[in-house]
């Protein structure tokens, strides 16, 4: 009996090794956590059936009290029986996979055992199927009530199931008592012990994975929580510096770097002497990620392709930062030892990049909301601005005495102007024709106040009037020209507005022949709010930020000016017709 126990323990070791190898396969672990439909259950049936078939083939053939064959079995003589660990695989499959998996594995194990033959072939086949049914429904009940199946419970259940198999042998096999006396105790001991070990090992590996994921999730969430206030400011050198410092404080990386599409925005850690913020990108890996938009990793200096000799960074993972589907920068985690770049670090970097991309999109949406609110406030202020309103009313009042029809038309233009203010304040994009109506209404009011002072010429391609543009853009540029471009005594004040299509882009030009802008002030306009006696430049800054936020940096304002010659403001936007709803959704998402 002792020899039989020792031999069967060897078979248990083989099954445990097989289970250990399978437990390190990601697909197998996922199937144990969750089975989505019958395909996943079929996969589990196939996997655990391998356990039971191996158990059958590695069983020990016994005739009476004599061990006949302890090698790989091809068949069993009609007078012999088998002592094996088949019940281990059937029991574990039912407990972890439920009734369908348990019955499936039990049936395959039973049929295979019956085909091997021997005096106990039928009783073992029936007991295998019963084992699958019993363990499957027990596993289902435990899962239904959210109870954990412990290895100890699995061992006790194995004692019961092997005992049931012994009862089947007594009922079906002639002279079953002698067989039971020989194999009962070894099979009960070894199968219960094997079930305990196998389930303990599988659960330990699953717990280890869950703990690693929990730790990683906690780490990512802590980093995300600390970096959120900075990414609300956008992808700037100042915000990226704080973000890189936060990530570097967490153990695991030797250096952290963030870039936009052109230059290094921040670098903290090793190699700070040549990975310098504001400098152009120096690694080929970063350029490739920006070009492809794909995650890339390197485990050698040659693959990183740093141009600086003696760079200590030997491994890296570079992840694209995206906004609305466009790659706008990269997050780079560097290591001085290639072995540090594990799968855990890769998943950490991927998780951070996704969260950072979301934070950048939220920050951009927040900025767009603020800019739209600013535009709305400006529009509302224009409605109740007493000077603007009084001047318009006084002009209409004066015309009532001399030209009633013109006064009536001017009142209509005033209503159009206010209506455009209200509509534009509630939308991100409007048809160009609506914006032109706004401009025309404003010009009618100004030209009525100052007859023959301003000459505004508009050259608009008719097919572009349905193109979607941000509200207040042209109106504010024209208003800005009339208010600030011309000295009081300039005799002829000319403004030209050109809108035309070129290479799939809509080009806008607003020119004047005014006094021009000083070079120092010209460099600041559109990029920041500038305090001066001539104005703050808020309108140009608002327009510029809205254009960049909606369409990207390539649509920013370009301002050219010469003193006493005039100023020209140009910008381009993609040609979009009838897509306002989709564009608004993409900006707000």
Curated annotation (Swiss-Prot):
Q: Cite the InterPro entries for this sequence.
A: Bact_2-comp_sensor_kinase, GAF, GAF-like_dom_sf, HATPase_C_sf, His_kinase_dom, Sig_transdc_His_kin_internal, Sig_transdc_His_kinase_LytS_TM
Give the way it sits in the membrane. Answer: Multi-pass membrane protein
Phosphohistidine PTM sites in chain numbering: 387
Which Gene3D superfamilies does the record match to this protein? 3.30.450.40, Histidine kinase-like ATPase, C-terminal domain
**Membrane spanning residue stretches:** 4-25, 45-67, 87-109, 116-138, 153-172, 184-206
Localization terms from the record: Cell membrane
**A Gene Ontology molecular function term of the record:** ATP binding
* Reactions that this protein is recorded to catalyse: ATP + protein L-histidine = ADP + protein N-phospho-L-histidine
Against CDD domains, the record matches this protein to: HATPase_LytS-like
EC number(s) recorded for this UniProt protein: 2.7.13.3
Query: Which top-rank group of organisms is this from?
Result: Bacteria
Q: Please state what class of enzyme this protein is.
A: transferase
Cellular component terms (Gene Ontology): plasma membrane
Q: Which residues form the Histidine kinase domain?
A: 360-577
Task: Provide this UniProt record's keywords sorted from A to Z.
Answer: ATP-binding, Cell membrane, Kinase, Membrane, Nucleotide-binding, Phosphoprotein, Transferase, Transmembrane, Transmembrane helix, Two-component regulatory system
Instruction: State where it is primarily located.
Output: membrane
What region holds the GAF domain?
235-360
One GO biological-process annotation of the entry reads:
cell wall organization
This molecule's function is given as: Member of the two-component regulatory system LytS/LytT that probably regulates genes involved in cell wall metabolism.
Q: What is this protein called?
A: Sensor protein LytS
Q: Which species is this record about? A: Bacillus cereus (strain ATCC 14579 / DSM 31 / CCUG 7414 / JCM 2152 / NBRC 15305 / NCIMB 9373 / NCTC 2599 / NRRL B-3711)
The gene from which this protein is expressed is lytS
């Amino acid at each position: 009996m002792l020899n039989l126990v020792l031999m069967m323990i060897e078979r248990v070791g083989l099954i445990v090794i097989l289970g250990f190898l399978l437990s390190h396969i990601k697909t197998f672990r996922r199937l144990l956590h969750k089975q989505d439909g019958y395909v996943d259950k079929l996969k589990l049936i196939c996997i655990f059936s391998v356990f039971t078939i191996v158990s059958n083939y590695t069983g020990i053939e016994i005739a009476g009290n004599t061990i006949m064959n302890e090698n790989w079995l091809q068949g069993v003589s009609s007078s012999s029986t088998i002592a094996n660990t088949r019940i281990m695989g059937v029991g574990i499959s039912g407990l972890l996979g439920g009734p369908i998996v348990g019955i499936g594995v039990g049936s395959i194990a039973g049929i295979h055992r019956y085909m091997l033959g021997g005096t106990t072939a039928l009783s073992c086949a029936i007991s295998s199927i019963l084992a699958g049914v019993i363990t499957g429904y027990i596993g289902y009940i435990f899962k239904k009530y959210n109870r954990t199946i412990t290895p100890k419970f699995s061992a006790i259940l194995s004692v019961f199931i092997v005992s049931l198999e012994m009862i089947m042998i007594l009922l079906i096999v002639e002279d079953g008592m002698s067989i039971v006396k020989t194999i009962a105790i070894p099979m009960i001991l070894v199968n219960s012990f094997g079930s305990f070990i196998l389930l303990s090992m599988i659960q330990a590996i699953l717990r280890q994975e869950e703990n690693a994921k929990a730790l990683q999730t906690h780490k990512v969430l802590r980093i995300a929580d600390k970096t959120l206030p900075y990414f609300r400011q956008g992808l700037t050198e100042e915000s990226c510096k704080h973000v890189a410092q936060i990530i570097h404080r967490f153990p695991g990386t030797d250096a952290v770097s963030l870039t936009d599409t052109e230059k290094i925005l921040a670098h903290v850690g090793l190699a700070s002497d040549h990975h310098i913020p504001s400098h152009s990108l120096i690694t080929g890996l970063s350029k490739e990620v920006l070009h492809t938009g794909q995650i890339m990793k390197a485990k050698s200096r040659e693959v990183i392709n740093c141009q600086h000799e003696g760079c200590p960074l030997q491994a890296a993972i570079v992840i694209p930062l995206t906004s609305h589907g466009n790659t706008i920068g990269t997050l780079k985690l560097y290591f001085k030892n290639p072995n540090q770049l594990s799968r855990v670090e890769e998943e950490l970097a991927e998780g951070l990049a996704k969260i950072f991309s979301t934070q950048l999109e939220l920050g951009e949406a927040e900025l767009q909301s603020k800019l739209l609110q600013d535009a709305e406030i400006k529009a509302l202020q224009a409605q109740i601005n007493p000077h603007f309103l009084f001047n318009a009313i006084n002009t209409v009042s004066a015309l009532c005495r001399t030209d009633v029809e013109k006064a009536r038309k001017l009142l209509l233009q005033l209503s159009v102007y206010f209506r455009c203010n209200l509509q534009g304040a509630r939308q991100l994009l409007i048809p160009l024709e609506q914006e032109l109506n706004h401009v025309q209404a404003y010009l009618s009011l100004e030209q009525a106040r100052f007859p023959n002072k301003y000459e505004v010429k508009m050259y608009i391609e008719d097919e572009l009037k349905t193109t979607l543009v941000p509200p207040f853009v042209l109106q504010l540029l024209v208003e800005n020209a009339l208010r600030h471009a011309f000295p009081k005594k300039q005799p002829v004040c000319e403004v030209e507005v050109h809108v035309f299509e070129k290479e799939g882009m809509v080009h806008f030009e607003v020119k004047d022949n005014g006094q021009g802008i000083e070079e120092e002030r010209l460099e600041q306009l559109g990029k920041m709010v500038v305090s001066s006696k001539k104005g703050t430049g808020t309108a140009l800054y608002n327009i510029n930020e809205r254009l960049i936020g909606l369409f990207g940096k390539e649509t920013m304002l370009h301002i050219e000016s010469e003193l006493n010659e005039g100023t020209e403001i140009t910008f381009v936007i993609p040609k979009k017709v009838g897509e306002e709803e989709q564009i608004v959704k993409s900006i707000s998402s």
